[in-house]
Every structure is written in structure tokens, then in C-alpha cells.
Amino acid sequence: MAKKALINKAAAKPKFKVRGYTRCQRCGRPRSVFRKFGLCRVCFREMAHAGELPGVSKSSW
């Protein structure tokens, strides 16, 4: 889990646009966040396996 101060800092609008960054909405992780879902890869995988993300299925080829 990310520190609350860092989550609040990321939520605030930065002075310059390029300083803004995405964080996982569930755990606050700053890296590897899917913009479409707003989740990091770890949370995305957990929720997909639990069937909590509609329209997401495991691919196989």
C-alpha cells in the first residue's frame, strides 16, 4: 500500500501538466497502471481472476 500522503499528492492538480501521473485506484501503486481501468497490473490480475472486471477474459492462442 502506498502512503496516504503520496496518494493525496498525486490526487492534487500539479502546477505543470507534465508532473501529473497515474496511480492505482485500489492500492495506490504508481507504476504499471492501465489507464483504461485505473488499476495496476497486480490489482487488475486479481480482479480479472475473481471475475470483477466485466468484458475481461484470459486470452489463449
Curated annotation (Swiss-Prot):
Record keywords, A-Z: Metal-binding, Ribonucleoprotein, Ribosomal protein, RNA-binding, rRNA-binding, Zinc
Cofactor: Zn(2+)
UniProt-listed PROSITE patterns: RIBOSOMAL_S14
Record carries keyword Metal-binding: yes
Top-level lineage group: Bacteria
GO molecular function, one term: rRNA binding
SUPFAM superfamilies on file: Glucocorticoid receptor-like (DNA-binding domain)
Presence of the UniProt keyword Metal-binding in the record: yes
One cellular component term from this protein's GO annotations in UniProt: cytoplasm
InterPro entries: Ribosomal_uS14, Ribosomal_uS14_bact, Ribosomal_uS14_CS, Ribosomal_uS14_sf
Cofactor annotation remark: Binds 1 zinc ion per subunit.
A single BP term in Gene Ontology: translation
Binding of Zn(2+), residues: 24, 27, 40, 43
Functional note: Binds 16S rRNA, required for the assembly of 30S particles and may also be responsible for determining the conformation of the 16S rRNA at the A site.
Homology family: Belongs to the universal ribosomal protein uS14 family. Zinc-binding uS14 subfamily.
Assembly description: Part of the 30S ribosomal subunit. Contacts proteins S3 and S10.
Name of this chain's protein: Small ribosomal subunit protein uS14B
Species this chain originates from: Saccharopolyspora erythraea (strain ATCC 11635 / DSM 40517 / JCM 4748 / NBRC 13426 / NCIMB 8594 / NRRL 2338)
Gene for this chain: rpsZ
